[in-house]
C-alpha cells in the first residue's frame, strides 16, 4: 500500500481516495499515513449503505474520527445509487456537524435519482460532486457535468465552467462512445435507469 501510494503521487496523482467496504477506519490508517507522508491529499470515502446501524449519529461520529486521523476530506461513496435526495440533506448535515473537512459526493445514476441527490447535497453544504461528461454519463455512471453546471448557473453554487468548452469536450468524446457501443465494449443495459436498484442494492460497478 505504501509503495502504491508513493508511486501514484510521484506519477501525478494528487488525491488518494481511500475506502474500506466495511467503513472500518483501522483498515485505512496505513494508506492515510502514506498519502500524508508523500504530501498527497488523503481523502477517506465512506461507503453509503442502508441498515439499522447506519444512523445519523453513526455518520457524525465517523466523520469526527476521520478528521482526527488526519484526513484532508471526506467522500460519500454511494456506489449503488441508493442515497435519496432528502436523505442526502440529512447525511451531509450530519457529516458537517461531526467534521470541518470538505465533503465530496459520489453516486451513480442507476436508480435515476442522482442529479436530485446532488442538488440537495450541495444545498446542504457538500463542497464537491463527481460528474461525467455527457457521452459517458447517466446509467451506472454519474450525472452529466453539463447538466449540473447549468443547474447551478446563476446561483451561489455557480461553477463558472464554460458550457461552450464543455460542448467541445463532449463532441470530442462522442465518437468514442459510439465506437464503444458498436463494438460491445459499452453494454447498453448499463445506460438506462433501473429503479429496482433501490431493492436489490447492487453497486454500479458490478453491473
Summary of predicted features, one role per range:
Residues 1-17, 21-207:
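Catalytic cores and adjacent flexible loops of soluble metabolic enzymes
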Amino acid at each position: 500500500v505504501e509503495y502504491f501510494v508513493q508511486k501514484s503521487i510521484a506519477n501525478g496523482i494528487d488525491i488518494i481516495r481511500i475506502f474500506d467496504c466495511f467503513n472500518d477506519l483501522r483498515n485505512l490508517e496505513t494508506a492515510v499515513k502514506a498519502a500524508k507522508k508523500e504530501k498527497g491529499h488523503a481523502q477517506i470515502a465512506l461507503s453509503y449503505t442502508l441498515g439499522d446501524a447506519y444512523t445519523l449519529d453513526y455518520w457524525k461520529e465517523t466523520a469526527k474520527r476521520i478528521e482526527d486521523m488526519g484526513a484532508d476530506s471526506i467522500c460519500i461513496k454511494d456506489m449503488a445509487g441508493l442515497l435519496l435526495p432528502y436523505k442526502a440533506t440529512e447525511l451531509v448535515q450530519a457529516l458537517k456537524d461531526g467534521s470541518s473537512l470538505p465533503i465530496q459526493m459520489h453516486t451513480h445514476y442507476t436508480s435515476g435519482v442522482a442529479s436530485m441527490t446532488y442538488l440537495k447535497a450541495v444545498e446542504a453544504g457538500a463542497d464537491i460532486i463527481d460528474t461525467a461528461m455527457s457521452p459517458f454519463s447517466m446509467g451506472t455512471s454519474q450525472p452529466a457535468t453539463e447538466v449540473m453546471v447549468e443547474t447551478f448557473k446563476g446561483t451561489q453554487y455557480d461553477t463558472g465552467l464554460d458550457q461552450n468548452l464543455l460542448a467541445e469536450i463532449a463532441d470530442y468524446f462522442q465518437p468514442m462512445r459510439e465506437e464503444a457501443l458498436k463494438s460491445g465494449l459499452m453494454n447498453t443495459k448499463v445506460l438506462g435507469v433501473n429503479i429496482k436498484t433501490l431493492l436489490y442494492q447492487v453497486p454500479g460497478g458490478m453491473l
